[in-house]
């Protein structure tokens, strides 16, 4: 049987929905994912307009989109997913169809994508409908599309994120700045943003160095860190105050004991491969059933502490996206 092997690039994933006619392409907006490539696009936090993509990289994405649409003779909608890695743009996949991001990008750009594409298919060009080719001007507001999961209703389901889509819905956070927009999105998912200031950390070895500055941020913001042995030793070696908790098999001071005290706000669990056969899976399932927010991506954990640092004293604003 044939096997396809792709090289994995730990880059920034970017997504485009575009409308194509015989003369050109209209790109309502470019969407940037918070989680790096490897997490299914439907499970990633999506940001419009992009926050960390250079203007010259955006232009390359526009150019690739136009060239691909022309080469594939697409009339109507096209969805393209890219990876930006070390200032190089790579194409993950091209889908000559609509995608789940169409309602999102239509709402936040005020371009009725489905309506325009339908008229294109029926013979009316993009320009005849009053739009210009190329990338549409970006809006001043920032819009965050955040996935919602139903793991508590699916007994035994693995919650760590990967290439298989697991989310069952999404919410939208909108503001004039990124940090408030993502703060609203976190609240919209029903997550109790940390209040008790206790966080459990269990991080695989290959991610410990990357986790270090994130751990420092949580500690400096006033959180007490609890960690299993490997993560505990690593944080202690780098002079970050942390309390040790034992694995499930131990009889006292276990991770379960702490979770049962109802004092844990958040769990950051970066699993190893095949961790569903180990303690990690049991911990993640217990957290879901106990209603404790748990993140299995450092990018999400980083986004949360960033917005908490900048939003903890401010009032959230109201934004009318129809204006």
What is each residue range found by the language model?
Residues 97, 205-206, 271-275:
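Short glycine-rich anion-binding loops that position phosphate/pyrophosphate groups of nucleotides
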Residues 1-195:
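ATP-dependent carboxylate activation and anion-phosphoryl transfer catalytic cores
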Residues 246-247, 255-323:
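Peripheral docking tails and interdomain loops at the edges
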Residues 188-199, 218, 257-264:
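Glycine-rich phosphate/diphosphate-binding loops that line cofactor/substrate pockets in enzymes
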Residues 222-234:
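Short internal beta-strands
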Residues 214-220, 288:
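Surface-exposed amphipathic alpha-helices with a cationic face
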